[in-house]
Amino acid sequence: MATREACGQFAAASAAMAAASSQNPSKATMTDPRFRIRPLQQVASACTGAMVTACFMTPLDVIKTRLQAQQQALLSNKCFLYCNGLMDHICPCGPDTPNPAAAKPAPRFSGTIDAFIKISRTEGIGSLWSGLSPTLISALPSTIIYFVAYEQFKARFTDIHYKYTRRPDTIAHDIPHPIPFLVPLLAGVSGRILAVTCVSPVELIRTKMQSQRMTHAEMFGTIRQVVQSQGVLGLWRGLPPTILRDVPFSGIYWTCYEYLKSSFGVVEPTFSFSFAAGAISGSVAATITTPFDVVKTHEQIEFGEKFIFSDNPPKQVATKSVAMRLASIYRMGGVPAIFSGLGPRLFKVAPACAIMISSFEYGKSFFYHYNIDQHNRSNQATKGPGS
């Protein structure tokens, strides 16, 4: 029954999209509360986009991890930071961490392409999706909360903007009123803060269990220990550096993306436009925030090694300000050190942002036309066949 209903929704939405392809909807129609994408529809769109992104990006991270592993032996209580602008997680690199190449000696890799070819030949193409998949799957809730929260905040801020700034003559003639870029900026920042705040305690517990293979009883004991030694706020110990890493990126990313849509007069973006705009926006945001990202990556990895992947975490640790860390990095390597890792970061962030936003926008477009079709059907049923 559910399958037939879903197929019916897909057919109805597809027909509505085909009928509307010959005419471009106005901004007033897109912002009409009657046709707005509902939260559950946003969840479905974000979940689909996150899964597609994970499927495409996991091989790149498996290759990156294998290249790092051959440079130095994986040490106990060490970790690395997985971040592509959409998902951000501290991952353990201890001796008990599952390694897809543990069953056979790993060949030497000279680079990304060489690693891709050798891993595919010696271990099978499926091995490129092993190892990091559980981590990526656990990152889906954060991504879903982030994108749904952005859409909700954007709708609320847009309503507030229209309420206090839209002139009566534009309302009477249904004239679109431009939305300032402060709206996507605030929506992106608010959505990211909400997402990392909700997921931070769960992520701390998950990484602790993963690194030490805890049972559920041991997990609750660890939670009690953290609360007793550091208070309830100890569960959010890694929140500040995460927020300081992600908030600038999110604000710049969404502002650039909405700016591109506005500059090209795009109301309902196509898949190709969303893909290109997402890649450009992600690249701009990644480039601008790279110095800050370098500082916060060092801080987050240090936090992971001292507090998450340590059997005896210290109760207190000396803290350094962002300015102090940035100055220290600059003294050691100058400007190149501050922008270190920009190339690999762009290589990951640009496609991840492009895949995620294009998949998300396609899902939104699907449900948008479905809502219009349902509204029209409801009106026809209300008027009756003879009207």
From Swiss-Prot:
<feature type="repeat" description="Solcar">
    <location>
        <begin position="269"/>
        <end position="366"/>
    </location>
</feature>
<keyword id="KW-1133">Transmembrane helix</keyword>
<feature type="repeat" description="Solcar">
    <location>
        <begin position="37"/>
        <end position="156"/>
    </location>
</feature>
<dbReference type="GO" id="GO:1990542">
    <property type="term" value="P:mitochondrial transmembrane transport"/>
</dbReference>
<protein>
    <recommendedName>
        <fullName>Solute carrier family 25 protein Shawn</fullName>
    </recommendedName>
</protein>
<dbReference type="Pfam" id="PF00153">
    <property type="entry name" value="Mito_carr"/>
</dbReference>
<feature type="transmembrane region" description="Helical; Name=6">
    <location>
        <begin position="337"/>
        <end position="357"/>
    </location>
</feature>
<dbReference type="GO" id="GO:0160007">
    <property type="term" value="P:glutathione import into mitochondrion"/>
</dbReference>
<dbReference type="GO" id="GO:0005743">
    <property type="term" value="C:mitochondrial inner membrane"/>
</dbReference>
<keyword id="KW-0813">Transport</keyword>
<feature type="transmembrane region" description="Helical; Name=4">
    <location>
        <begin position="235"/>
        <end position="255"/>
    </location>
</feature>
<feature type="transmembrane region" description="Helical; Name=5">
    <location>
        <begin position="275"/>
        <end position="295"/>
    </location>
</feature>
<feature type="transmembrane region" description="Helical; Name=2">
    <location>
        <begin position="128"/>
        <end position="148"/>
    </location>
</feature>
<dbReference type="GO" id="GO:0170036">
    <property type="term" value="P:import into the mitochondrion"/>
</dbReference>
<keyword id="KW-0496">Mitochondrion</keyword>
<feature type="transmembrane region" description="Helical; Name=1">
    <location>
        <begin position="43"/>
        <end position="63"/>
    </location>
</feature>
<comment type="similarity">
    <text>Belongs to the mitochondrial carrier (TC 2.A.29) family.</text>
</comment>
<dbReference type="InterPro" id="IPR045315">
    <property type="entry name" value="Mtm1-like"/>
</dbReference>
<keyword id="KW-0677">Repeat</keyword>
<dbReference type="GO" id="GO:0022857">
    <property type="term" value="F:transmembrane transporter activity"/>
</dbReference>
<feature type="transmembrane region" description="Helical; Name=3">
    <location>
        <begin position="179"/>
        <end position="199"/>
    </location>
</feature>
<dbReference type="GO" id="GO:0005739">
    <property type="term" value="C:mitochondrion"/>
</dbReference>
<keyword id="KW-0472">Membrane</keyword>
<keyword id="KW-0812">Transmembrane</keyword>
<dbReference type="GO" id="GO:0034634">
    <property type="term" value="F:glutathione transmembrane transporter activity"/>
</dbReference>
<dbReference type="InterPro" id="IPR018108">
    <property type="entry name" value="Mitochondrial_sb/sol_carrier"/>
</dbReference>
<keyword id="KW-0999">Mitochondrion inner membrane</keyword>
<comment type="function">
    <text>Mitochondrial transporter required for glutathione import into mitochondria.</text>
</comment>
<feature type="repeat" description="Solcar">
    <location>
        <begin position="179"/>
        <end position="263"/>
    </location>
</feature>
<dbReference type="InterPro" id="IPR023395">
    <property type="entry name" value="Mt_carrier_dom_sf"/>
</dbReference>
